[in-house]
Amino acid sequence: MNRPVFPVYHFLVSAAILVFVVIFWRTHHRDHRNWLALRLFVLCSVNRWPLRMVKGTVVGTTDTLREMQRYEQLSSTGLTTGKSSREHRYMIRLLLSLVRVCAGIICQCMTIPYQPHRG
């Protein structure tokens, strides 16, 4: 059963602040009331952002965990992309060849003796 924990907690904290304000307002002098009003404004303003921060962290962590599990599942079945492993190897070889050609051209332009990697 899924219970709305955060809204109930937020309501209880807000109700406790309200009760405290009413009691304090009736029992203290005007100078104390002005200072209290400023404090309560800050407290009530800050009361909302921790809730959003916690919710955002929980949701972000959950989404990241789901994505990791999905990636692991796709990796184990070999469905990470539509390309086969042969196509991947071909693309890697092509990229490495391009890098070697570019390195050779750069070394020629800079008059550095080029030594290709043997492997």
Curated annotation (Swiss-Prot):
Known EC number: 2.7.-.-
Gene Ontology CC annotations of this record: plasma membrane
Membrane protein topology class: Multi-pass membrane protein
Localization in the cell: Cell inner membrane
Gene Ontology molecular-function annotations: transferase activity
Key words of the record: Cell inner membrane, Cell membrane, Membrane, Transferase, Transmembrane, Transmembrane helix
Cell inner membrane is among the record's keywords: yes
Transmembrane segments: 5-25, 94-114
Similarity field: Belongs to the phosphoethanolamine transferase family.
Protein name: Putative phosphoethanolamine transferase YjgX
Native species: Escherichia coli (strain K12)
Lineage: Bacteria, Pseudomonadati, Pseudomonadota, Gammaproteobacteria, Enterobacterales
